[in-house]
Curated annotation (Swiss-Prot):
Homohexamer. This is RNA-binding protein Hfq. One of its GO terms (molecular function) is RNA binding. Belongs to the Hfq family. Residues 9-69 form the Sm domain. It comes from Oceanobacillus iheyensis (strain DSM 14371 / CIP 107618 / JCM 11309 / KCTC 3954 / HTE831). GO terms for cellular component: cytosol. InterPro entries: Hfq, LSM_dom_sf, Sm. It holds the Pfam family Hfq. Keywords: RNA-binding, Stress response. RNA chaperone that binds small regulatory RNA (sRNAs) and mRNAs to facilitate mRNA translational regulation in response to envelope stress, environmental stress and changes in metabolite concentrations. Also binds with high specificity to tRNAs. GO terms for biological process: regulation of DNA-templated transcription; regulation of RNA stability; regulation of translation, ncRNA-mediated.
Length: 74
């Protein structure tokens, strides 16, 4: 059986590895800006000005990076 591609993990990993700054739009309307430092199935760790924020994925609406992210072709 073919392995399914997890676009979300690929996308977040590229943001993390390439240190791409992002604006994170939350479902309550707030915007957070920073770098993705880590992520798992339920959370994203965002760093802004040396401070970290752990954001639950269910509270995230959109990631808007400052530049396009290319996904690995596997």
């Amino acid at each position: 059986m073919a392995q399914s591609v997890n676009i979300q993990d690929q996308y977040l990993n590229q943001l993390r590895k390439n240190h791409i700054s992002v604006t994170v739009f939350l479902t309550n309307g707030f915007q957070l800006r920073g770098l993705v430092k880590a992520f798992d199935n339920f959370t994203v760790l965002l760093e802004t000005d040396g401070k970290q924020q752990l954001i639950f994925k269910h509270a995230i609406s959109t990631f808007s990076p400052v530049k396009n992210v290319s996904l690995d072709k596997e």
